Amino acid sequence: MEVPAWRKTIGEMVRDHMRSPEMEHYFSVKMNKPRARLMITQLGLYIRHRRDCWALVSANCPVMAVKQAILQHEYGEVIKDQFSDYGHLHLIIRQAEKLGMTPQEVIDTKPIGTTTATLHAWAWITHAKSWIEGLSALTVTEWTNDDRLLNDVGGGHSTRMGKRWTDDMGIAWRDMPNFVAHSQADEEHSDMFLPFLERYAVGEKEQMALDAVKESLDLFGGEARHRHRQRDALCAAHRRHRRGEIRHELVEGF
């Protein structure tokens, strides 16, 4: 396939994924601080893990032009770009501060079980499979943030989740730097690897690349759903804790 055909094919796969009942439910859940804290800290782990995965794809790939593109991609993610002079993890830290969290809390975050499983799966794809499959699996997750592709269904992941944060917690868009950055930077990232798929994902490798895209979208959706369930569990625990405090105060009052 040529670049336009790759863009159309992957684009439709992403649109189908983002319109799925599971993702619609994910975006419909009311956001609050316990849920938001879990989300932003697990996203921090995801961003850090991406660096390992892109390095694995580069190590598996013999094509210097692909290695150069990955380094260009990673410079903005790790070093600096127009959104941060300190890399994109700094955006997570700044956004978490709006939830009352410290930088150290973000850095010291432990993954929940489903995060661990999902990150291990992406690591396996990028390590054990071909570089074409690894590249396809990684780049498609950035397509889920592409507002150009998803505008008619409410926007990409960052835009839609940012709206939830604003509607449910009153946090302004400008105070969500991670969402702001990835709603824009990932549009560029969606395009940058398509020429390599056109050139190298040919013959049977074409279907291998598309299978990797599908597998990665399934991982992305599954991780989001499980994170949502964990947020619900945390909120339920928080409510039980608050009810216990209130009962204690009532007893003390007597």
PLM regions: where:
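Non-heme di-metal
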Residues: 1-254
